[in-house]
Amino acid sequence: MADAEKNAVAEKNAVAEENAVAEENAVADKNATKEVLAEAASVLEPVGLPEEAELPAKIMEEFMRNSRKKDKLLCSQLQVVNFLQTFLAQEDNTDQNPDALASEDTSRQKATETKEQWKELKATYMDHVDVIKCALSEALPQVKEAHRKYTELQKAFEQLEAKKRVLEEKLQLAQKQWVLQQKRLQNLTKISAEVKRRRKRALEKLDGSHQELETLKQQAGQEQEKLQRNQSYLQLLCSLQNKLVISESKADDKDVKGPALPPKSP
């Protein structure tokens, strides 16, 4: 009976040590997985705006599928740990109850099965970790390429923004020049209207001056005709006056000489 108890205690200690080692390995694997995921997260972290740094749909889908697998593995490990805790609790109860030592073989069989399940789960977990690492190793170059293209697109976008600002400045300058040209055109239109108005007034005055000139020409012609008639009349008067003077001088000469002698008869 004492040997059975010693064997049970030794088996219990061995199971506890194996569980401790398994837990340490699980923690180490979990930490390694966290490091891999942290590295992936640092690479997958968006550089600019979230909508501008979205990963391709296939990469995100693969990453989410691997995350679900990891969660399932963690749940399975928790179930195994729970089973081990339950088993250890039952072993504690067995130590306190001597009647339960008869089930030592059954306990060993369960412990062996638990070890096998743990090994299988660990192997499956490591396989999935390797799959995740491979998927990440395949995804990282694509992510880097996406980041490179994003950087190129960002530079191109900045260049386009710079060109846009230059074009906007040119557009504003052109609009200001257009406004100035419109003001100048309005001023020229006003000046042209004023020049046309003054020209029209000058033409009207010129037409009036032409009419006055024609009237003056007609009046001058009439005055010229009057002058010619007056000159003709004066000439006629002068000629008549000269004739009268000559006649009077002849009469005076006759009076001075006396009566004229009668002509001699033959």
From Swiss-Prot:
The keyword Coiled coil applies. The keyword Methyltransferase does not apply. Residues 136-237 form a coiled coil. Pfam families: Zwint. Its main location: nucleus. The modification Phosphoserine is found at S232, S265. GO terms for biological process: cell division; establishment of localization in cell; homologous chromosome orientation in meiotic metaphase I; mitotic sister chromatid segregation; mitotic spindle assembly checkpoint signaling; regulation of meiosis I spindle assembly checkpoint. Expressed abundantly in brain and at lower levels in testis and kidney. It is found in: Nucleus; Chromosome, Centromere, Kinetochore. Transmembrane segments: none annotated. Keywords: Cell cycle, Cell division, Centromere, Chromosome, Coiled coil, Kinetochore, Mitosis, Nucleus, Phosphoprotein. Residues 105-115 have a biased composition (Basic and acidic residues). Residues 95-115 are annotated as: Disordered. GO terms for cellular component: cytoplasm; cytosol; dendrite; kinetochore; Knl1/Spc105 complex; nuclear body; outer kinetochore. It comes from the Eukaryota. Component of the KNL1 complex composed of KNL1 and ZWINT. Part of the ten-subunit outer kinetochore KMN network that includes the KNL1, MIS12 and NDC80 complexes; a bioriented kinetochore contains approximately 150 copies of the network. Interacts with the MIS12 complex subunits MIS12 DSN1, and PMF1. Interacts with the NDC80 complex subunit NDC80 during mitosis. Interacts with ZW10. Interacts with CETN3. Acts as a component of the outer kinetochore KNL1 complex that serves as a docking point for spindle assembly checkpoint components and mediates microtubule-kinetochore interactions. Kinetochores, consisting of a centromere-associated inner segment and a microtubule-contacting outer segment, play a crucial role in chromosome segregation by mediating the physical connection between centromeric DNA and spindle microtubules. This is Outer kinetochore KNL1 complex subunit ZWINT. It comes from Rattus norvegicus.
